[in-house]
Amino acid sequence: MKVLVINCGSSSLKYQLIDMDGEKVLCKGLCERIGMESSMITHEANGHKATTPAIFPTHTEAFAEVVKKMTTGEGKCINDVSEIDAIGHRVVHGGEKFKSSCLITDEVIETLRELSPLAPLHNPAGILGIEAARKVFGNIPMVAVFDTAFHSTMPPKAYMYAIPYEYYEKYGVRRYGFHGTSHKYVAYKAAEYLEEPIERLKLITCHLGNGSSIAAVDQGKVVDTSMGMTPLAGLMMGTRCGDLDPSVVNYLKYTLNITGHQLDEILNKKSGLLGISGVSSDKRDVEEAAAAGNKRAQLASDMLNYQIKKTIGSYIAAMRGVDAIVFTGGIGEHDAIARAKICHHMDWLGIRIDTEKNKHPQGDVCEITAWGAKVRTLVIATDEELMIARDTKEVVENK
C-alpha cells in the first residue's frame, strides 16, 4: 500500500509518499507561499532534490503540481496517481468529537468546521487541504489523523479546568493536548526498543522543539500532558509563553491598552525564548548567546530546562513511577546540553545519563542511560509522517 501523507498550512503544503511495504519514503516535498506571487515547490525523490518556482493561486493547483512532480521528470516515483492507495491528512484539533483517526466524509469535514474555533490558526488550513485534495485525487480514500487523539485517554481530573462546569459542557473548554502523533510514535518506538509491551510501561515522552510538550504515558495511554486547550499552554517555547497566571492577560491588556488579538500575538509570537532572551526563538542561538555571557539568554535557557525538569517530576508522581524518559523533537534529539541539565540532580529518582553517550547519540533510537540507573533514558528521532501513514493504513484496511 502506498500512502500520501499531507500536512497543510494556510500557505503551505508538506507531503510525503510512503510505500508501507517496508515503510520506505518514495518522495517528499513542500509547496510554499501558496496564494502569493513567489510560490515554489521543493521535491525530493531518487536522490534528486530541486526547488522550482510555480504558480499556486490555491492549494488545488499546489496538489496538481505535486502530482506532476511525482509522475514525471527526475523526481518521478510513481507512474500514475492511481498507484496511491490512501491519503492521510494531519489535522491539529479533533476536540472531543474525534478520539482516533477516521475516514474523511462530508460529515467529518462539517464537524471539523464546527471545531475550528478551538484551533483557528490550524483547522481551517487542514480543511482547505482536504477539500483541495478531494478535487485532485477524486475517490482515493482519505483519513484524518488528529494531533489531539492520542491524548483522548486523559481522565477528567487531568483535562478539566477549575472554571464553571457549564463552560466545558457548552463550549468545550478543557485540556486537549497536542503533538499526539509524535508522542504516540516515540512511545511505541520506546516500547519496541525496551522489548516490553507498551501496556506494561510507564513512559514520559518529551517532544521538545520550537513548540514543546510533555506527555505521561501509562500502560500505553496518556494520563496527562502539558499543552492545554491550545498549543500555547504548558512549557515556554520558541515564541510562546507557556503557562501563565490568567490575570496577567487582563493586566497587560489594560496596562498596554491593546486588543485581545494584539495580546494573543504577543503571547504566541513574541514570548518564550525570544521574549526572555531578546536574541532568538532558536534554542541554539540562545545557548550561543548565553555562552558569550548574555544573562537574559542564560535565563531563558535555565527557565526552559527548569520547567521541563519540573514537569517530568510531576508526571513521575502522577504515574507513581517511570520506566523510561524519551527525548524527541529538534531540541530533544539534538541538544545534549539541555538533556544533561534536565537530568542533572535527578539521581534520587533513578534518572542518570551517561555523559559520553549523551554527547553523541547515534541512530533512530539511542539509549543514554548511565550504568546502574533504574530509569532508562532514550533519544528517539520522531517520525510523524510515518505515524500518520500507519494510522491511515489501519483505518483504510479496517473500513
Describe each model-derived feature in a short phrase:
Residues 12-56, 228:
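Short glycine-rich, Thr/Ser-proximal phosphate-binding strand/loop in the N-terminal lobe
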